Amino acid sequence: MLQIVGALILLIAGFAILRLLFRALISTASALAGLILLCLFGPALLAGYITERITRLFHIRWLAGVFLTIAGMIISFMWGLDGKHIALEAHTFDSVKFILTTALAGGLLAVPLQIKNIQQNGITPEDISKEINGYYCCFYTAFFLMACSACAPLIALQYDISPSLMWWGGLLYWLAALVTLLWAASQIQALKKLTCAISQTLEEQPVLNSKSWLTSLQNDYSLPDSLTERIWLTLISQRISRGELREFELADGNWLLNNAWYERNMAGFNEQLKENLSFTPDELKTLFRNRLNLSPEANDDFLDRCLDGGDWYPFSEGRRFVSFHHVDELRICASCGLTEVHHAPENHKPDPEWYCSSLCRETETLCQEIYERPYNSFISDATANGLILMKLPETWSTNEKMFASGGQGHGFAAERGNHIVDRVRLKNARILGDNNARNGADRLVSGTEIQTKYCSTAARSVGAAFDGQNGQYRYMGNNGPMQLEVPRDQYAGAVETMRNKIREGKVEER
């Protein structure tokens, strides 16, 4: 039994050693092959690289290529047809093959036309300068490889080396030149086709999933994945900056939507939202269906976070969505944010502050008392204050959530918090929003009127500042549109949303 166990151990150890030896052999062979290739083709590659750098420095890269191609074609015809090569016979493959590669190199000089076609799709030469440099490097390297191929028979004659061996060496150099030229041509063609495909897809497809589309492009074109992604990002960014495309980061990744198509679809949906005062999540989902052709996960996430025609409000019966068209028919507890429908008579002045319960009123009063209490007095009574606050855990928790996240949305807590910050900075600041003047400023800081909107997303924070009926910006001061204050983490999205509104003429200039 012990002998069997010992034999198994030796067998396993032997296999492990053989595996290590095989890996070492493969690594050694790879390194040796790489060294041989470097010795064979490295000088030609280095010469091509140096030539490209020098001609680029003097801005004669294309012109030098033209002269080199003409000279190469003349020499190739002299070798192939007139038999001027000492070691090559005329009208044979060995002498005629150079005509083929030189003609192919001449075709590569059409690169300015290729670049012009690429530019028509939105890519500039600066965007692909690295690829153009590599293209010319391949062009010049191919000529040096052809020169090595032509010199191989001469070396065999001069140094009495086996003609057969040098013939294979010359053929290897010529094949390397041919492959180099074909690879360069395929790369510039793939680049042109890629830019055309991206532009055409953006024109034809109103909705695209970024990740799946990029993966498809990387699989379809023989370009490095990093280059494909860079070209793709460049063209996408251009259209987003021009307002032709919108990007949404949703549950299953980023989605790209044609802006005009999106606006048409959402305009119709926002009109439907005006038909009822509020919608439950299921009612909203049924109404919206999948009008943007998103995946189910992305569609649900869009409804939850990205609708800019209204916002979610916490009613006593649950969370409901209300169009900004009906927002004046609501009243919101200044303490906990609870919302209810309030059909006030026309020209009725709303209450400066409304509380849904005596508990919320007591909480707000207590917070104000603590804020106004002198620091030393607050410290001395900290224990008592703590006991009082402990009596109101549920309401306090709700308030704290609203303070921290912006709550459902009009910035009652944000007005006061930012007001305190401005006062600490020695700015002349006061709160105006408590008088609830229609379309009035919330705060006045050093003579600047500021409207505060703290909703759950940037689109909703900005959307809450626009009229639900005509879509125009509601808050106009004596000096033009009032400044809009949103949460810090929504700033980038709010700027993009406001830029779109301005582009659509929704903000009046004075």
Swiss-Prot record:
From the Swiss-Prot or TrEMBL record, state where the protein is found: Cell inner membrane
Entry annotated with the keyword Transcription = no
Major location category of this protein: membrane
Q: How does it sit in the membrane?
A: Multi-pass membrane protein
Identify the keywords attached in UniProt to this record, alphabetized.
Cell inner membrane, Cell membrane, Membrane, Transmembrane, Transmembrane helix
> Which regions face the Periplasmic side of the membrane?
23-30, 83-94, 158-164
Indicate yes or no for the key word Membrane: yes
**Listed transmembrane segments:** 2-22, 31-51, 62-82, 95-115, 137-157, 165-185
Q: Name one GO cellular component term.
A: plasma membrane
Cytoplasmic side, ranges: 1, 52-61, 116-136, 186-510
**Descriptive protein name:** Inner membrane protein YeeR
